């Protein structure tokens, strides 16, 4: 099952270098592949998290399509841009998508919509979620090791 996040904003970053700088300002251990121009993002975006290969699907979406696809969601205002993040069940993909989305939202003055929860998060809330994910990773890894032993 794929999960999705969306960054809603009124501005866009101009380059992958600009996005990476936003990630670096948050001191996230995430490196995005900078070969694809940010304006051409569509599909899987390779990344490295703490030196391990990972990534997530990422692309620009029309605002109208995004809003129309969520009739029960209420947004406090109209936004100009939507950047979509999608990943499967891999925990590194989850963590890297949240880090990348939080940094992008902060750099563009945007917010994050979590499709699973049907909830909009401020940048501050998104940064807390990233910290929660980072704190839970050792427990998740231990649980997965225990499952493999059984």
For each predicted feature, which ranges?
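Acidic (Asp/Glu-rich) sequence patches and key acidic residues
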Residues: 1-150
